[in-house]
Amino acid sequence: MTRADTIGTPHTRARRRHYHDEMNATPATFVQHHDANEAGRDFVVGDLHGCVDALRYLLRQIAFDPTCDRLFSVGDLVDRGEHSEQALALLAKPWFYAVLGNHEDALCAVADGRLRRQWWYGIGGAWAADVPDERLRYYAEHLRTLPLVRVIGSGKTRFNVLHAEFFGSDADLDAGNYSAETRQQLLWGRELALGHGDPLRQRGLSLTYCGHTPVRDITQIGSQVFIDTGAFGPDGTLTIVQPQALRRWSISVEAARAEGAAELALP
């Protein structure tokens, strides 16, 4: 995803444009700040990808209190798993705070007519084959309100949430006037997780939770913590972390269903 497709000969080679180059589905807000949660606890969940049953189980396991706790999401609520529309319904929950992921960005591109449905189906969007255009546009309208970055708290307890990766400091992140290259990096970047990025390029960055690149276990590289443990895959799990307490919980969809998660109500 991160390597540019090219066309032509070595002498005339040009970069093939991707739908996300122009970012017509630019979020209404690039970065959103949240005060520290003095009344309850904050959690961050990895790429959900429609695996809502695993989320139901984990919320019960952590005794999530919707009156005072908050759940932040690194994005990619939809595609690949079985319950993408249930995952989108989480956006209406007052305790749920997601950032835009590349799969939500693809949904918006399809709704805008910038991307063919067949391309999206190829990366997991086939659940929407029978979803009318009108409903898809409704989802896109709500997804466009999601920021690319969420900043929680300040000082030593501050942490950031974004989808893929970021190179820069807290000050760079807070500025919010991201270039097209930075926006693509926030949604699609994999340099750091795959070992191709320089960890020193994140000096001055607070603890930052990311998803996008599936990892077998939570992986920290410098300030960035990758928590997409592949919930949709046969050997994957959904992971929730509690930043301040440095705690984590994980479960597979299969194991969650064996525990009756499908019958659990979301808060």
Report each predicted region and the residues it spans.
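Active-site neighborhood of divalent metal-dependent phosphoester bond hydrolases
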Residues: 84-152, 156-158, 168, 175, ...
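Divalent metal-coordination and catalytic microenvironments
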Residues: 47, 76, 101-102, 128, ...
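Conserved beta-sheet core of the metallophosphoesterase superfamily
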Residues: 185-254
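Beta-strand-turn-beta hairpins that frame and shape the catalytic cleft
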Residues: 36-43, 151-160
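Active-site-proximal beta-strand elements of phosphoester/diester hydrolases
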Residues: 42-49, 159-165, 226-227
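Core catalytic region of metal-dependent phosphoesterases/phosphodiesterases
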Residues: 41-45, 50-119
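Active-site environment of divalent metal-dependent phosphoester hydrolases
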Residues: 49-53, 79-82, 104-108, 167-169, ...
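Short glycine- and acidic-rich boundary segments immediately preceding or forming the N-terminal edge
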Residues: 2-49, 53
